[in-house]
Each structure stands twice: as C-alpha cells, then as structure tokens.
Amino acid sequence: MSEHEQAHSQLDSVEEAIADIAAGKAVVVVDDEDRENEGDIIFAAELATPELVAFMVRYSSGYICAPLTAKDADRLDLPPMTAHNQDARGTAYTVTVDANTGTTGISATDRAHTLRLLADPEADRTDFTRPGHVVPLRAREGGVLVRAGHTEAAVDLARAAGLRPAGVICEVVSEEDPTGMARVPELRRFCDEHDLKLISIEQLIEWRRKNEILVERQVETVLPTDFGTFKAVGYRSIIDGTELVAIVAGDVASDGGENVLVRVHSECLTGDVFGSRRCDCGQQLHESLRLIQEAGRGVVVYMRGHEGRGIGLLAKLRAYQLQDEGADTVDANLALGLPADAREFGTSAQILYDLGVRSLNLISNNPAKKVGLEGHGISIASRTPIPVAVHEDNVRYLKTKRDRMGHDLPDVALWEQEHPEN
C-alpha cells in the first residue's frame, strides 16, 4: 500500500464530517502533502461556543481565522489586511476584528461571540471593532473546486451542513513535536482521542465534484489547424462566466479515460498570439498540439483567465516594466502586490472529467501543476516535459522559473554551458 493510500485509509467520510459540523461539533481537515500538509480544526462559525474555541486554542496555534464568502466580507466591510499580499498560498487575510460588545476580545467567550456575529446575516460593519482577535479570511468563489485550501473547505463544509457559509479554522500543533505541526498519523490519533472526524480536502473536492458541476459544456465543433484537425469543445464557468475551450484529438474517453496526453495551457496573449520572445508559452502550446496530434489522442485545455499566471494582461505588462528595470518574474509580481502564481486548476480538472479523462500523461515542465490537478480528483500517470528554445530574450525568465518556481528546464543548463559569460 502506498503512503497516499495508507493516509487515505485513516480518513473518515465527508458525509460523517458534514453531519458533525451540522451538529455543532468540530472536525479536522488535512490538505495535500505537497501543499501545507497540515490539519486544521474546523467548525461552523454560526455554532461557535466558548468550549469549541477553548478546545481549538488548547490544541492549535491559537491563530483563529474565520473564512467567509467574498459577499459577506464585502458586506461587513472587511478589506485586505495588506495591500501587498505575499502569502505563499494566497490566503486572503482581512483586517482583524472583535465584536464591539464584550471585554478584551481575547477570551474564548469573546471570540466565540465574534465568530457567531461574523456568521450573522443581520450583522454589519458597526458591530465590530478593528483591529481585534479574530482573523476573517476571504474564501474563493467556487470553494475547494477552485482553490484547494482550508479557507474554502471551511465555507464548503458549513454550507453543505445547511448552515451559514462561514467557518472557523486553526492549525493543529504537534504534541509529539511541539516545534512543528501535526501530520496525518498523529492527526488520526488526535481525532480518535477527542472523538473527531478526520477528512482531507481531496475527499471534499471529490465529494463536491460528484455532487456539483461548476462548468457547463456549451458547444462542440470541428477545428482544422496547422497541426491537424481537432474537435473544439466550448465551456462556460458557472462561477464567473469565463469562456473556456478544450482542443481534443481522438476518443479520450476510450480505455476508461486512462493515460490521456493532456496539456493544461494558461492563456498568454503575448506569447500565444503575438509570438513574444519573453516567454516560452507559445512554444509550449504549439509543441503540445503537435504531440497530441501525433499521438492521435489527447486534450489541450486552454485556460482563459490565467493570463500572467493569473494576474491579468495589464498587470503582466506592468510586471514586464519592472523586469525591464531588473526585477525577475517573481519579484515583479510581488512588487505589484500580486502573488507569484495566482492560478487554480479546479476548472480544468472538471473539464477533463467531463470529457471522460480519468488519468493523464501531463505535458508540462511545471511539477506544481501536477499537485494542482491531482488535488482536484484527476490522477497523473506520468509527465512529459517540453523542450524549450532558450535565447537571450527569455533566458532570465526561464532561469527564474527553474530556480524559484521549480520548473524542470534542462535546456537552460545547456544554454548556460554554451554561454558561460551570461
């Protein structure tokens, strides 16, 4: 049995966790081992009690956060904690708050009151003081199907339990090693000791994927290209209306949808359309289409809305300005107050699943993309790297992708050997 299977065998069912949330109990939710690999105590903000808060503080870091929908965060006038969010996971912290009635705000009783108030649909901004001792978080619309984080998991669980979409989360600290965080084996023992259910975000994603659809297939047509004839399948996101397209060769649902050659390609107007030499996006798109046509079976999912690794076209051009002044592609984004990579792959996973794909040979130089897709119910059988043409216009960008973002780019090392002066 693999480590992944062993960990999964120690988990309870999503249905059991939802039932406990509805009953006012806490559960523990663990995320992907390649993400934070941490377990959070989670319960519904609407049903917060001093006892639940005291338990959370006793066994966690004590940094209690309250995930809310973006709509509720706006209604309560909860702006971002900082204009320049540099959190590695893109966690959307807002200003901290306390209920405006109570004592110091730090006690379990006061924090439970603040949490219930955050979940109250009748509450408004005047019911809170700022700063405080509870940290609201803004959850992504679409929940764990869009972002596989504890923030979204808490909101999804509360909603699935028939409660207000507001949760309470805090990371479980290891009792066996108080300097670190608890991992799955210890979390299982912790949950057994305290009669708590333990589930994973991966399970919750799978549960939601089976029960909900966030993309709709709209149209299907033949698409002749310079690389051969494909089928173009158009989709629309139910969340924000973004129009997406899958370029399909052959019968990808045959053989159980196993080991399908797939490229999940992030939109890049400058590289894909204008042939920009600052990036390798156009090269990767064209090579992927060629490989798939050659194989006779595969998919390119073209992810609109991923421009500039998710920051948008104009922001990407502003980042280019900063790169012209010496910043690399990561620092340029951060200097603009934007994440180095804001992309999420839940929508692409749903498109692949709708097409009948169950496991895939991923065409990518980015190992992190594997984690993003696997966390959304798609299994990665293998990964096919794409050779890139390295030249003076893109070498700095490619070096940053290799050195700071973990991309697999052996062609860069070859270029460095041939150009030691650079």
UniProtKB/Swiss-Prot annotation:
GO MF annotation list: 3,4-dihydroxy-2-butanone-4-phosphate synthase activity; GTP binding; GTP cyclohydrolase II activity; magnesium ion binding; manganese ion binding; zinc ion binding
Cofactor note: Binds 2 divalent metal cations per subunit. Magnesium or manganese. Binds 1 zinc ion per subunit.
Catalytic activity: D-ribulose 5-phosphate = (2S)-2-hydroxy-3-oxobutyl phosphate + formate + H(+); GTP + 4 H2O = 2,5-diamino-6-hydroxy-4-(5-phosphoribosylamino)-pyrimidine + formate + 2 phosphate + 3 H(+)
The protein's name: Riboflavin biosynthesis protein RibBA
Family: In the N-terminal section; belongs to the DHBP synthase family. In the C-terminal section; belongs to the GTP cyclohydrolase II family.
Binding residues annotated for Zn(2+), in chain numbering: C268, C279, C281
Pfam families registered for this protein in UniProt: DHBP_synthase (PF00926), GTP_cyclohydro2 (PF00925)
Species for this entry: Corynebacterium glutamicum (strain ATCC 13032 / DSM 20300 / JCM 1318 / BCRC 11384 / CCUG 27702 / LMG 3730 / NBRC 12168 / NCIMB 10025 / NRRL B-2784 / 534)
Binding-site positions, Mg(2+) 2: E36, H150
Pathway membership: Cofactor biosynthesis; riboflavin biosynthesis; 2-hydroxy-3-oxobutyl phosphate from D-ribulose 5-phosphate: step 1/1; Cofactor biosynthesis; riboflavin biosynthesis; 5-amino-6-(D-ribitylamino)uracil from GTP: step 1/4
Residues that bind D-ribulose 5-phosphate: R35, E36, D40, R147, A148, G149, H150, T151, E171
Magnesium is among the record's keywords: yes
PANTHER family: 3,4-DIHYDROXY-2-BUTANONE 4-PHOSPHATE SYNTHASE (PTHR21327:SF18), GTP CYCLOHYDROLASE II-RELATED (PTHR21327)
Role played: Catalyzes the conversion of D-ribulose 5-phosphate to formate and 3,4-dihydroxy-2-butanone 4-phosphate. Catalyzes the conversion of GTP to 2,5-diamino-6-ribosylamino-4(3H)-pyrimidinone 5'-phosphate (DARP), formate and pyrophosphate.
Region (GTP cyclohydrolase II): 211-422
Positions of the UniProt region annotated as DHBP synthase: 1-210
Any one of the GO BP annotations: riboflavin biosynthetic process
Protein origin, superkingdom: Bacteria
Keywords for this protein: GTP-binding, Hydrolase, Lyase, Magnesium, Manganese, Metal-binding, Multifunctional enzyme, Nucleotide-binding, Riboflavin biosynthesis, Zinc
Residues of the site described as Essential for DHBP synthase activity: H133, E171
Active site: D341, R343
Disulfide bonds, paired cysteine numbers: none
Protein EC: 4.1.99.12, 3.5.4.25
Listed GO CC annotations: cytosol
